[in-house]
Design a protein with these regions (language model features):
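Conserved hydrophobic/aromatic beta-strand scaffold that supports enzyme active sites
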Residues: 36, 52-54, 80-84, 97-99, ...
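Short beta-alpha junctions and helix-cap segments that line functional grooves
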Residues: 24, 50-51, 68-70, 132-135
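A short, Trp-centered hydrophobic/proline-enriched beta-strand micro-motif
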Residues: 31-39
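A short core secondary-structure module
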Residues: 62, 66-129
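Long, acidic (Asp/Glu-rich), low-complexity accessory segments flanking structured domains
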Residues: 150-168
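Short Gly/Pro-enriched turn/cap motifs at secondary-structure boundaries
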Residues: 43-46, 71-74, 86-89, 136-143
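Active-site-adjacent elements of ketosynthase-type condensing enzymes
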Residues: 43-52, 122
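Alpha-helical interface subdomain recognition
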Residues: 2, 7, 15-20, 30-31, ...
Length: 314
C-alpha cells in the first residue's frame, strides 16, 4: 500500500505544476491517506495500447472520463486515483495522465469493506465504482479491486503535463517503481533464507543437521548467492536513478528481474527444505512462497523487463 501511494503520487511530483502539487500532494503530507495508481485494464495488461478507458472533451472545456481498471491496489480505501487513459476515443494513440480526487478520508476511518463494493458519488459529477476486493493467492493483506469511472468530470488542471504525453510520464515513473518492487522481492528472499537457515540448523535427519547434508548445503549456498546478487543489482539501480543516468531504466528492470528471481527461488527452495512442514500454514515459509509469485508479475512481467533491457543494450 505504501509503495502504491508513492507510485500514484510521484508522477505528480515529477511532472505536475506547483499548483497541482499543492492541491494533490499536500493532503497526503497532512493525513495518512491512500492513493491508487490505475493502469491495468481487463483487456490491457502488459500491452497498454489495448486500453479502452478514455477522456472525451466537453463543450465547456472540461472532459469526461469513462472506463474500467483492474487489479488496483488500495482501491477500496483510496482518497485519490491517478489514471492513465486514452484521449478523445478508445482507439486514440495518445494517452493522458489524470488525477481524480475522491474522498479525503483516512483509511482507518473507513469501515472494513471485507468483500463489499464501494461507490463514490463525486460532487463535480460522475461516480467511481470500486468492485469486490480480489481473493488473491498471496499478499492477501494488500487490498486489490477493480475500479470503474462512470462519466467522471475532469477539469484541465487535473491533467498532468501535456495531455498527449501521459504514457511517457507513466513509463518514467515505473523506473522508480521497479526498484521498490525489487526491494520487496529482496526482503522476501532474505526472510526465506533466514527462516530456512534456522530450520535446517535445528532439524536433524540421517544423524546430522539438515544444513550439514551436502545436497541441502548446496541449496542454501545457491539461495545465499541469489540474495547477494539481487541486493547488488538493487543498490546499483538506486544509484543510477539518484544520478538520473540515462540508462537507469535498464538497471531498474535488471533489479526487478533479479530480485523477483531471488524471491521465487528462495521461497520455493526454502519450502522444499522445510519438507512437509513447509506446506502447512503454521510455517511462515508457506506464506512467502505464495507472496513471491506476484513479484515476478506486477510492475512488468520478467519478459517485459527483458524486452526493455534487450532494446537498450542492442
Amino acid at each position: 500500500s505504501a509503495m502504491c501511494n508513492d507510485l500514484a503520487n510521484v508522477v505528480i511530483s515529477r511532472h505536475g505544476t506547483d499548483r497541482q502539487k499543492e492541491r494533490f500532494l499536500r493532503p497526503f503530507v497532512e493525513k495518512p491517506l491512500l492513493a491508487s495508481f490505475c493502469l491495468t485494464e481487463p483487456g490491457a495488461g502488459s500491452d497498454n495500447s489495448l486500453m479502452t478507458s478514455f477522456l472525451a472533451p466537453r463543450d465547456d472545456g472540461s472532459y469526461v472520463l469513462n472506463g474500467s481498471k483492474c487489479f488496483i491496489t488500495n482501491a477500496s480505501y483510496a482518497s485519490q486515483f491517478t489514471v492513465l487513459c486514452k484521449i478523445g476515443k478508445p482507439s486514440s494513440s495518445f494517452m493522458a495522465c489524470v488525477v481524480v480526487p475522491a474522498e479525503s478520508v483516512v483509511a482507518a476511518d473507513l469501515p472494513d469493506v471485507g468483500y463489499a463494493t464501494r461507490e463514490i458519488q463525486l460532487s463535480t459529477g460522475g461516480r467511481i465504482v470500486i468492485g469486490k476486493p480480489e481473493d488473491k493467492l498471496g499478499q492477501r493483506l494488500s487490498n486489490t479491486a477493480g475500479v470503474t469511472f462512470e462519466d467522471v468530470i475532469v477539469e484541465p488542471d487535473q491533467i498532468i503535463g501535456n495531455r498527449r504525453y501521459g504514457f511517457k510520464y507513466i513509463m518514467d515513473v515505473l523506473d522508480f517503481a521497479r526498484p521498490m518492487v525489487a526491494a520487496i522481492g529482496l526482503g522476501l528472499a532474505k526472510r526465506a533464507l533466514d527462516l530456512t537457515m534456522a530450520y535446517t540448523r535445528e532439524r536433524k535427519q540421517f544423524g546430522s543437521r539438515i544444513c550439514d547434508l551436502p545436497v541441502a548445503r548446496d541449496t542454501l549456498t545457491a539461495m545465499w548467492k541469489k540474495v547477494e546478487l539481487a541486493e547488488l543489482s538493487l543498490w546499483k539501480a538506486c544509484w543510477k536513478i539518484q544520478k538520473n543516468d540515462k540508462d537507469a531504466g535498464i538497471f531498474a528492470s535488471l533489479a526487478k528481474n533479479t530480485c523477483a528471481e531471488a524471491a521465487l527461488f528462495c521461497a520455493s527452495e526454502g519450502l522444499h527444505l522445510h519438507g512437509g512442514y513447509g506446506f502447512t500454514a503454521e510455517y511462515e515459509i508457506s506464506k512467502l512462497a505464495r507472496d513471491a509469485h506476484i513479484i515476478d508479475i506486477y510492475e512488468g512481467v520478467r519478459e517485459v523487463q527483458n524486452m526493455i533491457i534487450g532494446r537498450e543494450i542492442v
